[in-house]
C-alpha cells in the first residue's frame, strides 16, 4: 500500500483499545486519526484520558497522545478521513455494543470488532484468515439484509483462545486427518479479562479454574469458523465436538 488507511478505534481508553493503539503504532497499512470512548473521556486529549490508567508496558504511542477523544456515539465528530473502524467496545449490555457497531456500519464504515457482541449473528463473518477468508462472501448478504451502504459492514474476530489451536486442527483436516473430538484446556492471561481482572487481589499467585462464558465461546465459536456460507447466513459445522476447560493465570500477556 502506498498510502495508509486512516482508522478509528472505538473503546480506545480500555485495555483492549490500548492494545489496539500499541499494535497499530507505525503500522505499514493503518494510521489512527480518531479515538473514541465513553462520555467520561470525551473532549480530553488521549494522554489525559488514560492518565494513571495506561495498562500497557510500552509508553503511550506519540501519534495518539494529543488526539482528542470523541464520544463513541458522536458520529458528527468523526474525522472525515476515517475509512475503517476497529471496535474494542465493551458496553455493559452487549445488545448496546451490537447495535452501536451496526450504527457505524449504517453510516458507511467497515467495522472490525474485537467484541463478542456480534459473533453469533448469522450474517456476521467471524474470521481467522488462514482458515475461512471465504466467509467475507456473506458481507453482501449482510448489507442487503440490513440495508447497509456498500462501504459499511461488521466483521468480527473470535475469542482469544480460538486461534491458538484451531489453525492446527484445520491444517490436520486439510492434510486428510479429520478430527472428530477435541479436549481443550486454556491458560488465559489476565489481560484477556480487562483491567478489573488485572487489579483483582484474588489473581495474585493464583490460578482461577473457571472463566464465565469462556468455555462456551471456546467450544462453539470454532463451529462457525469451520462452517460454510449459505444464501441465508453462515451455517455451523457439526462434524467436530469440542470440550473445553478455561482457566485464568497470573500473567499479563
Regions inferred by a protein language model and the residue ranges of each:
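Charged docking surfaces used in two-component/phosphorelay signaling
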Residues: 192-253
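N-terminal Rossmann-like NAD(P) cofactor-binding subdomain of oxidoreductases
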Residues: 1-211, 234
Amino acid at each position: 500500500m502506498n498510502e495508509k488507511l486512516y482508522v478509528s478505534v472505538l473503546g480506545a481508553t480500555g485495555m483492549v483499545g490500548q492494545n489496539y493503539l500499541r499494535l497499530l503504532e507505525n503500522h505499514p497499512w493503518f494510521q489512527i486519526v480518531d479515538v473514541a470512548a465513553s462520555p467520561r473521556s470525551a473532549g480530553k486529549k488521549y494522554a489525559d484520558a488514560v492518565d494513571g490508567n495506561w495498562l500497557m508496558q510500552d509508553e503511550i504511542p506519540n501519534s495518539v497522545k494529543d488526539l482528542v477523544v470523541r464520544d463513541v456515539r458522536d458520529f458528527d465528530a468523526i474525522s472525515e478521513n476515517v475509512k475503517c473502524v476497529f471496535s474494542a467496545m465493551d458496553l455493559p449490555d452487549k445488545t448496546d455494543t451490537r447495535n452501536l457497531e451496526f450504527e457505524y456500519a449504517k453510516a458507511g464504515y467497515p467495522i472490525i470488532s474485537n467484541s463478542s457482541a456480534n459473533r453469533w449473528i448469522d450474517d456476521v463473518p467471524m474470521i481467522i484468515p488462514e482458515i475461512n477468508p471465504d466467509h467475507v462472501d456473506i458481507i453482501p448478504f449482510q448489507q442487503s439484509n440490513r440495508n447497509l451502504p456498500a462501504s459499511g459492514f461488521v466483521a468480527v474476530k473470535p475469542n482469544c483462545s480460538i486461534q491458538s489451536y484451531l489453525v492446527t486442527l484445520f491444517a490436520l483436516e486439510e492434510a486428510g486427518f479429520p478430527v472428530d473430538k477435541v479436549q481443550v484446556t486454556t491458560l488465559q492471561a489476565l489481560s484477556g479479562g480487562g483491567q478489573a481482572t488485572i487489579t483483582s487481589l484474588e489473581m495474585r499467585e493464583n490460578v482461577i479454574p473457571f472463566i464465565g462464558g469462556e468455555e462456551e465461546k471456546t467450544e462453539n465459536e470454532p463451529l462457525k469458523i469451520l462452517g460454510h456460507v449459505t444464501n441465508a447466513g453462515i451455517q455451523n459445522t457439526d462434524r467436530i465436538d469440542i470440550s473445553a476447560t478455561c482457566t485464568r493465570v497470573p500473567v499479563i500477556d
